Structure formats: C-alpha cells, structure tokens
Amino acid sequence: MMEDMTTGRIWNIDRNNRSFDTITGQNFSTLTRFHVPEEARILNRMGRPMDFSDLMLGMRVQVRHANFMTASIPPQTTAYEVRVL
C-alpha cells in the first residue's frame, strides 16, 4: 500500500461524516479533505490514542494517508493515521 504524509492545521471538521480539512499556512491551494475511517489511528501529542471527537479546529496535525487524491476541490483522500503535533 502506497502512503504519503501531510502536515497542516485543521481548518474544518465534519463530525457526521468523520472527515476534516487541513490547510498549510494561509495557502488555500493546500486545502485537503481527509476521510477518517473507524480503523484509522488518531494519536495525541504524547502518542496515545484519542477519539475523532477530540479533534479541534486549529490543531496542527500530521496525517499519514493514501498516496492518491480525488480531482475534486478540495482534493480528498483516506487518512490511515492522524497525529496531533
């Protein structure tokens, strides 16, 4: 399975669909939507598991995700691991 990493700040959270958008700096061309399946690992700053519901706007995160993205605006992909920085 090919993977990639993205680091950014959480810009928007869709709790109903378990997804969030990140942005790097103030550059809207970096906006990416990550879909977070139930089996994805979400880790706090200490490396301990946390719930999707604990993610908050403005958190800086590193996301390990699929190396493909949709051609939509914003691009979308599946997150395998979310780590709060």
Predicted regions located by residue number:
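Short, flexible, surface-exposed loop segments at domain boundaries
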Residues: 1-30, 45-85
